[in-house]
Design a protein with these regions (language model features):
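Short beta-strand/loop segment at the start of cytosolic alpha/beta domains
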Residues: 1-8
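Amphipathic alpha-helical interaction surfaces in cytosolic regulatory modules
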Residues: 10-39, 43-91
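Extended, charge-rich low-complexity interaction segments
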Residues: 98-104
Length: 104
């Protein structure tokens, strides 16, 4: 199962509203990942995103599903700025998970 999400439809030209990210996460991302499906975030027409938006969108799925989330979340048509923010959030989440595993 693959869930394609047109980000522009939900966020307009700039992804910054954490409440929208939370709703997308709850209504679309988590149910799809729980069925081992893939989620494709299509950023066509979106010029930028805040780090807090991306964090609100993917941090809980990564925490809950771990490697399944890393393997099944995809980003299409993300410009360089958005790709960099996604990378920052992924690095932060990976370091956070590694540190938690180290402490256990």
């Amino acid at each position: 199962m693959k869930k394609n999400i047109s980000m522009r439809k939900f966020v307009g030209g700039f992804a910054e509203n954490k409440d929208i990210a939370k709703k997308m996460r709850t209504d679309k991302v988590m149910p799809t990942l729980s069925k081992h499906g893939e989620v494709v975030f299509d950023f066509d027409g979106v010029s930028g995103a805040t780090q807090s938006f991306i964090h609100a969108l993917v941090s809980d799925p990564i925490r809950k599903f771990g490697s399944t989330a890393f393997d099944n979340l995809f980003y299409k048509n993300a410009n360089d700025d958005i790709q960099e923010i996604i990378s920052i959030v992924y690095r932060y989440m990976q370091e956070s998970m590694d540190s938690k595993n180290y402490e256990e």
